[in-house]
Amino acid sequence: FKNKWTHFFISIPVIIGGSFSAFFITSVNSFMNTPAGFEIKNGRMVNVQPLEAMFNSSFMVRALHVVATACMTMAFILAAIAAFKLLRHNHTEDRTYHTKALNLSMIVGFINTVFSMIAGDLSAKFLHKVQPDKLAAYEWHYDTQSHANLVLFGVLNEKTHEVSGALEIPGLLSFLADNSFDTKVKGLNEFPKNELPPMIVHYFFDLMVSMGIFCFIISGLYMLFLIVKKLRKYVTSNLMLYAILLTGPASMLAIEFGWFLTEMGRQPWIIRGYMRVSEAATQAGGITLVTTLFGLLYLLLLVTSALSLIHISEPTR
């Protein structure tokens, strides 16, 4: 919009709507993992307490993680756009404008990457106490023990439970679980096999963390270059700009991998401890129609968003 106030006021309902959407999605997902606020009597849900269900035990930890990673991703997408513009434009006026945008985006991105890492650490500690089977699946951790290793990537033999080709960091899983290398971390062998999530969740965890670490390193280097005067010339070097260009898709992938992780990590439950996914499958009519309409709606949103972005990017600034 040419008028900055029009742009500002139109953004307000988007911010409010997006925030409420994030709140309710996170609340529902938290409820599915740590259900609360109801009783089961004669196969029926009774004595429902909506607020207790909404603000269940995992809500705050998950909400912090969602907010931090969303802000991080937003910042890195904007930084990637600014970096792309700087790689294309050589005019002094354009470079000044996009450099300011890049500085602000990278600072916000770095701060929220740190918050995301703190939120991730709190999530690991929460899983250790409340969903130890999920944490064990993330790390292919089968035997209960202290000084448990953090396993990165590798290949698991699900019959023998042997892991090959992995990078193992001694004791780090125990430390992440409760700030001590002596912490005992429960292994998968302590849980019923038919209640364990698919072991592929390990890769989603590793990919999510890898993307996050990459964004942290790039934004950390940028902050260093920005603070130290002798290194400031590297802030808009081509190598740095290309690296920043990658933080946009990397941060988006981190969020996607994170959602795959939390949703697949909840399996086989749709409501943990109460209802399996297989029990929740519906045979109601009209599902095909509803699914098709949703698909068409999102296709329309994709096209209109792409056209809007193309239109916005046409002016020089």
Model-found features: residue ranges?
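Transmembrane-helix bundle segments that line or gate the permeation/cavity pathway
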Residues: 1, 15-40, 72-76
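Membrane-interfacial loop-to-helix junctions in multi-pass inner-membrane proteins
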Residues: 1-16, 93-106, 233-242
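Aromatic-rich transmembrane-lumenal/periplasmic boundary elements in polytopic membrane proteins
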Residues: 23-28, 108-177
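Individual transmembrane alpha-helix segments
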Residues: 58-69, 158-213, 291
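Membrane-interface transmembrane-helix boundary segments in multi-pass integral membrane proteins
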Residues: 61-62, 127-147, 279-299
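Hydrophobic alpha-helical transmembrane segments
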Residues: 70-80, 207-224, 297-305
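Membrane-proximal extracellular juxtamembrane segment immediately upstream
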Residues: 249-293, 297
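Residue-level detector of conserved catalytic or cofactor/ligand-binding positions
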Residues: 310-316
